[in-house]
């Protein structure tokens, strides 16, 4: 369970205030410990001073302090309740201590200088403040806002925390020394990289193509975390492919931008952006002091839900604070578990956001569904998939190669640091977008697998052949992408709505005598993992319902196909089903029996009062008593007559009714 932090709570800002001994900022006493943990990472040992603005960017430029320095800072700062401004001698002494660990002694005025290479190398070794967008690192540049705040009065704790996070994220996409090296200058890109950045344009968030990364840097960025999670956007500006639901001027987007979030059920196929939209709502909620809690119905229990609701009641009663509860895979909760939300959604204790791949009409309690707004997210179009993939490719520093140009990037041996470490063919990007079938998660993870596999295979080849490994000559082709995905990502759920959609499409295609469409829907189901016996049972039904007496042998064909599937199974039985499907599509159709039987059922359901009794002459008379009561009296045994027998077989109340002529009671 994930819960948003209390940093922006206006109530907590009114509690007892204390001063941080490191950065001199005022904050509630309850948060001093967590603040010190972050503050000691951002400020090197020996540089505590009361000025709130000017020293902060300089300390970031020097990089995080070593673990030993952090412990010294903690022991020194804990003994100071109200530290004074250090003298020049004390400042020099503290900087000398830093120099013992490998740093250089520098005066306070040198804080504005760009970070040194050694400082930049320290950044990956220590945790940094959370970033608002994936793939971005802290910048070593001093922000202009920090320079202007050098002589400002001490800020409130909320303002200081906001600027610390803003400075930790940085302004650029590259490393802190990117501007100093000039590697982020578009003049250092080659022509194809510049064209790729221009083509990406505003759809990539307005950021330029990142600087060229070494192959090992790309490998490290892709290891340990799925690329789909790393590239998850935080804003609606980077949320692509769902313009119908959250596009400009839509009702939902207006509600999200004004932070008036209703209870929602997000329904759509896997990888269409349900969880990402909830993540964007969570990011926006934290800025407005709204508590956001995440649960997954796959592992959460009813007690977990009750605990969250109890906390939400306390937050609302004491702090007047809203709570948004996001339930992923909400269809995994049974009806009694879903009933737990009803009174609390009704009275506004929580705002419920549920995500599901199943039809809410079948899987979500009707009472709960009536209290939520259903947002249908469609499968991502190919254009949106290309944009999402290009955003990830640019963040990895991979250069898109125009297949129409004959230049081979592997033909030259330049080792310039600004040269891209990896290339990918533009047709490989298009192929990946098509094979992903609208699933952004499958597409991004397929890209990650293709990149890692290509790097590993080239490294192994160079090792076996005795050649020197040249990471700047790696090319990802269309075949690499196909091997990474193996086959098209087929969306099919044997227990969900797509299951019923496909069997309905097969049934209607055979009824319409379209043999091509019938084969397509059959293959779609079987390749998606459908049980062949289920399809065979439906064909038996079709033989009597839609073909009927127009071709009585169709029922024999269907039963034979079912038995054959039972005998040999998949994949051999697929041709048996295909033969039966084509036979049914070509066969004449008749619903005479099917319609007549439906008329009989309607007659029985609409009959008023008790059903009419069976006529006496049609009753069986196995005993003497029944014969004495008139059972079977007057019945004419038809085989004994050469001519048709004039005899009534329906109850007297139904005489004259012809169910085959579409007459209803």
From Swiss-Prot:
Mutation effect (residue 41 to A): Normal affinity for ubiquitin
Signal peptide positions on this chain: none
Residues the record lists as binding Zn(2+): 20, 23, 31, 35, 39
GO cellular component labels: membrane; nucleus; perinuclear region of cytoplasm
Entry-annotated residues carrying Phosphothreonine: 85, 116
Biased composition (Polar residues): 76-89
Low complexity: compositionally biased ranges: 130-155
Zinc finger (UBZ4-type): 17-44
Entry PTM: Sumoylated with SUMO1 and SUMO2/3.
Protein name: ATPase WRNIP1
């Amino acid at each position: 369970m994930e819960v948003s932090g209390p940093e922006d709570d206006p109530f907590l800002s009114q509690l007892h205030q204390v001063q941080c001994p490191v950065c001199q900022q005022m904050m509630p006493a309850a948060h001093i410990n967590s603040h010190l943990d972050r503050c000691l990472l951002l400020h090197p040992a020996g540089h505590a001073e009361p000025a709130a603005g000017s020293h902060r960017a300089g300390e970031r430029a020097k990089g995080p302090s070593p673990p030993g320095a952090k412990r010294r800072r903690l022991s020194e700062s804990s003994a100071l309740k109200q530290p004074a401004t250090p003298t020049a001698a004390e400042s020099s002494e503290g900087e000398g201590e830093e120099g013992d660990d490998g740093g250089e002694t520098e005066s306070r005025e040198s804080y504005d200088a760009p970070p040194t290479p050694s400082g930049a190398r320290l950044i990956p070794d220590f945790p940094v403040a959370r970033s608002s967008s994936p793939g971005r690192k802290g910048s070593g540049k001093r922000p202009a806002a920090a320079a202007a705040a050098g002589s400002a009065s001490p800020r409130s704790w909320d303002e200081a925390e906001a600027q610390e996070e803003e400075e930790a994220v940085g302004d650029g996409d590259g490393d802190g020394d990117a501007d100093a090296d000039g590697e982020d200058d578009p003049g250092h890109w080659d022509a194809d990289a510049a064209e790729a950045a221009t083509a990406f344009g505003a759809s990539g968030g307005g950021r330029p193509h990142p600087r060229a990364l070494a192959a090992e840097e790309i490998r490290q960025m892709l290891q340990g975390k799925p690329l789909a999670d790393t590239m998850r956007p935080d804003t609606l500006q980077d949320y692509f492919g769902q313009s119908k639901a959250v596009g400009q001027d839509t009702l939902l987007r207006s509600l999200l931008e004004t932070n008036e979030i209703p209870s929602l059920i997000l329904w759509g196929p896997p990888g269409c952006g349900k969880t990402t939209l909830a993540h964007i709502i969570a990011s926006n909620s934290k800025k407005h002091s709204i508590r956001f809690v995440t649960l997954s119905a796959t592992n959460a229990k009813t007690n977990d839900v009750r605990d969250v609701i109890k906390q939400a009641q306390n937050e609302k009663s004491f702090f007047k604070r809203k709570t948004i509860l996001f339930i992923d895979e909400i269809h995994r909760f049974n009806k009694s578990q879903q009933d737990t939300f009803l009174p609390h959604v009704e009275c506004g204790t929580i705002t419920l956001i549920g995500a599901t791949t199943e039809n809410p009409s079948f899987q979500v309690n009707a009472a709960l569904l009536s209290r939520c707004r259903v947002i249908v997210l469609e499968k991502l179009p190919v254009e949106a998939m290309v944009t999402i993939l290009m955003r990830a490719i640019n963040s990895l520093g991979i250069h898109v190669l125009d297949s129409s140009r004959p230049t081979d990037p592997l033909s030259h041996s330049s080792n310039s640091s600004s040269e891209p470490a990896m290339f990918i063919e533009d047709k490989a990007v298009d192929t990946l977008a098509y094979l992903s079938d609208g699933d952004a998660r499958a597409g991004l993870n397929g890209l990650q697998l293709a990149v890692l596999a290509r790097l590993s295979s080239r490294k192994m080849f160079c090792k076996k052949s005795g050649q020197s490994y040249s990471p700047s000559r790696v090319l990802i082709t269309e075949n690499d992408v196909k091997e990474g995905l193996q086959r098209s990502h087929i969306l099919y759920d044997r227990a969900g709505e797509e299951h019923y959609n496909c069997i309905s499409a097969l049934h209607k295609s055979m009824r319409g005598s379209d043999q091509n469409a019938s084969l397509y829907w059959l293959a779609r189901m079987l390749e998606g993992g459908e049980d062949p016996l289920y399809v065979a049972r439906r064909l038996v039904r079709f033989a009597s319902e839609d073909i009927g007496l127009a071709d009585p042998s169709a029922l024999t064909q269907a039963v034979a196909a079912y038995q054959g599937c039972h005998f040999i199974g998949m994949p051999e039985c697929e041709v048996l089903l295909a033969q039966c499907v084509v036979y049914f599509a070509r066969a004449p159709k008749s619903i005479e029996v099917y319609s007549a039987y439906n008329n009989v059922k309607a007659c029985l359901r609409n009959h008023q009062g008790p059903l009419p009794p069976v006529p006496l002459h049609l009753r069986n008379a196995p005993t003497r008593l029944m014969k004495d009561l008139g059972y079977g009296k007057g019945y004419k045994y038809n085989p004994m007559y050469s001519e048709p027998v004039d005899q009534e077989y329906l109850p007297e109340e139904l005489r004259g009714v012809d169910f085959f002529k579409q007459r209803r009671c």
